[in-house]
């Protein structure tokens, strides 16, 4: 019985919705398509080119994956590039170019087929269909496709009539597009504006009355205004909540662990100890570094724990404390060394190595738990401009995984060394990372996953990757 309970608490949860093996859901004659509460969702982008649809698609996908909702982007433009191999000019997108129109339609259908495979056979929960989808006819095809398979549909329409924003988007993103390899800036701008004109001729935005039964959000001019209609469930609610918090203002986020602590020196996890001598030196150097950066309107955040607060105090600037930034709660293993955990709880030590992301310390937390409590922090980071977050190893890994789009399996093993600042600068479709070591020595607290993760392993094998400590 105990083994069974162990299995139930340590096994990864699967989604409730289970697709039928056939292509379409079975339905009794005269009945409607069943709509399960947890049925898969198609998020469908709508809008003219250079309106930030791909930016929104990738960013939203990264967020949903981070919170544990399996999500994938299906970019129809990439299907088109794969099918045509070469791009000549805007004339490919003319409405009277019948041959090109046929290719574009086939690419969209191919992408929809892959959406079905992902949602029905690959345990996906959300598929983001990234294309212009500017006509009612195209959107009707997508709606019918989703209806036949029992998928929910949520539209995201990005509307922008500010020529400066459009030109900036073309310059930042389209210049590096495979469509324009080797082209100069002026030719790219000219051709892409003509491509937009081709779509503009037949553009039919979502209509307040005609589309009143649909679920959607309209985003005007990169978030200056929003219109939300008929949100159906928590996935759509979270998508709306997220989209209303993000912005594109240039900024940097600085992540740093606290200075080396007294318990770090002893190789003990958790606790609430103060800084070591070297930790205090780092706090001083961190203050000098931040001052040298001359960062406008910098906000500084810490956890409620002594070692992050002592680190922030050395900066001589105002700071805010977040309980959500506290280190992972190791429960019964608090303030123990890895050697002591292996000695007292060898089974728990092995179970954590088997699935470090989902393993929860007895009476403590898992990395998965930390991600859930960090969601408000991520939302506020998305709203802010320049921020320095002084936190802890597990927390920093979770934040870093969000910005770098890392999987749950990669997250617990991201390297976040002491006395090092990570400067994260959002770029077009990702995040640029700079690692700045402030030249103050510290112990190594990073433990790699050992080769043998079985409960029956020898203690030497279990402790093989434990870093040296005093």
Swiss-Prot record:
Q: Which residues form the signal peptide?
A: none
Gene Ontology molecular function terms on file: 6-phosphofructo-2-kinase activity; ATP binding; fructose-2,6-bisphosphate 2-phosphatase activity
What are the alphabetically sorted keywords of the record? ATP-binding, Hydrolase, Kinase, Multifunctional enzyme, Nucleotide-binding, Phosphoprotein, Transferase
What positions are marked as the site Transition state stabilizer?
257, 264, 392
Q: Which domain of life is it from?
A: Eukaryota
- Entry-linked CDD domains: HP_PGM_like
Q: Which SUPFAM superfamilies match?
A: P-loop containing nucleoside triphosphate hydrolases, Phosphoglycerate mutase-like
**Which residues of this UniProt protein bind beta-D-fructose 6-phosphate?**
80, 104, 132, 138, 174, 195, 199
Q: Which intervals of the chain are annotated as region 6-phosphofructo-2-kinase? A: 1-249
> Its catalytic activity?
beta-D-fructose 2,6-bisphosphate + H2O = beta-D-fructose 6-phosphate + phosphate; beta-D-fructose 6-phosphate + ATP = beta-D-fructose 2,6-bisphosphate + ADP + H(+)
One Pfam entry for this protein is 6PF2K
Q: What is its EC number?
A: 2.7.1.105, 3.1.3.46
User: Which Gene Ontology cellular component terms are annotated?
Assistant: 6-phosphofructo-2-kinase/fructose-2,6-biphosphatase complex
Q: Which residues carry this modification: Phosphoserine?
A: 31
Region of interest (Fructose-2,6-bisphosphatase), residue spans:
250-470
UniProt note on regulation of activity = Phosphorylation results in inhibition of the kinase activity.
Which amino acids does the record list as binding ATP?
Answer: 47-55, 169-174, 349-352, 393-397, 429
The catalytic residues are 130, 160, 258, 327
Q: How does it assemble?
A: Homodimer.
Q: Which PANTHER family match?
A: 6-PHOSPHOFRUCTO-2-KINASE/FRUCTOSE-2,6-BISPHOSPHATASE, 6-PHOSPHOFRUCTO-2-KINASE_FRUCTOSE-2,6-BISPHOSPHATASE 1
What protein does this entry describe? 6-phosphofructo-2-kinase/fructose-2,6-bisphosphatase
> Which species is this record about?
Aquarana catesbeiana (American bullfrog)
